[in-house]
Amino acid sequence: MHRYKKEASNLIKLATPVLIASVAQTGMGFVDTVMAGGVSATDMAAVSVAASIWLPSILFGIGLLMALVPVVAQLNGAGKREQVPFEIQQGAVMALLISIPIIGVLFQTQWILGYMNVDAVMATKTIGYIHAVMFAVPAFLLFQTLRSLTDGLSLTKPAMVIGFIGLLLNIPLNWMFVYGKLGAPALGGVGCGVATAIVYWIMFLLLLFYVTTSHRLRQVQLFTTFHPPQLNAQVKLFKLGFPVAAALFFEVTLFAVVALLVAPLGSTVVAAHQVAINFSSLVFMLPMSIGAATSIRVGHMLGEKSTEGARIASHVGILVGLSTAVFTALLTVILREQIALLYTDNRVVITLAMQLLIFTAIYQCTDAIQVIAAGALRGYKDMRAIFNRTFIAYWLLGLPTGYVLGLTDWIVEPMGAQGFWIGFIVGLSSAAAMLGVRLHWLHRQNDEIQLNYEAR
């Protein structure tokens, strides 16, 4: 029991800065939504649709680079910090390379919106937002590379501080470019994209300054020796990161595709859907931060060749995450009207958003289990298991269920947005079950097999 309490303390110390950093980053989306909503419902809806295209694209790149966290954590646990600079420099190369196709995908926004029959005015604003924010792609991915370094070394506070600075900068920059203050043009929802691009470049430069000047990273000597790009290293990183990226892509696109499918239902439905999605993303930061901390702790324990420590870290992560999820689910149900009022004063939007917030409360517990179990499996570098199971859960179970219930009369009369949210519940709950079973299976293997996964 003492080891569990000690592990819980270590986990919370790691997870708290990750949580604050993640909330700050997601809070930027909240600020975008609220400020765009202050212009018009169409601007608010445009930001929602733009996020549905931007997030899956950029998060695929982030997923590739997330593989660096357990790599760094295991090297740190094994006392091999001298190997860390090579891995991070190769990660920076990967970040720049993957920026090219991501920007290429973002350039296809007009085609995507045309295919989805989105309203012309909303489409114009959405395209403007995407064209502005695509300039942030390299900065966003390079920031993630450096964050993989600090997080992997169990230094989660730097990203927290910089994330909070980014949020504080995003508010006045949005104010300037959305409403046309201090001589800036009044761009409406497009101004949110301009502000976001500026903020991400500032955040990258701040983290770069930290890792090159902090006395806590002197032993790492990140840029003392230049390591040229190596094809084998790039292939290895890609193979390790691709399943994580694909799994993250599957989950995010489950929400993003639904937002695009909901778009033709009108601005009111889109706005209510965006309220529920944005708040759900804020709440999701709790279990996601615990999952990230669990990944770090599992990786560190495996670096020390302690499979028992890795098992305890996994169990503690799930217990802590499930406890917080029960609490947030209850608060969501009780305060759903007040939550909706934070986003808009449109009563029609509020009424529909309150209904959708009930669905967010329902799946919070299973969502916590799936994201923390995935974090533990990342610590083991059991990436393929995450890939396979999330694909089945999100694309073969969740999305088809949502589509059938939301837009067809095959089972019941078309339920609209509510049907898609039932699909979310099915997908996330299925992922929780499958990933939880996989983690339990891994824990039952002997030490040699578990450490063999670690060595992959």
UniProtKB/Swiss-Prot annotation:
Main subcellular location of this protein, as a coarse class: membrane
Gene Ontology molecular functions: antiporter activity; xenobiotic transmembrane transporter activity
InterPro entries the UniProt entry points to: MATE_fam (IPR002528), MATE_MdtK (IPR050222), MdtK-like (IPR048279)
Membrane-spanning residues: 11-31, 53-73, 93-113, 126-146, 159-179, 189-209, 242-262, 276-296, 315-335, 356-376, 391-411, 417-437
Statement: the UniProt record of this protein carries the keyword Cell membrane: yes
Membrane topology type: Multi-pass membrane protein
NCBIfam families, sorted: matE
Physiological role: Multidrug efflux pump that functions as a Na(+)/drug antiporter.
Stored PANTHER family: FMN_FAD EXPORTER YEEO-RELATED, MULTIDRUG RESISTANCE PROTEIN NORM-RELATED
Family that this chain belongs to: Belongs to the multi antimicrobial extrusion (MATE) (TC 2.A.66.1) family.
Protein name (database record): Multidrug resistance protein NorM
Organism name: Vibrio vulnificus (strain CMCP6)
Taxonomic path: Bacteria, Pseudomonadati, Pseudomonadota, Gammaproteobacteria, Vibrionales
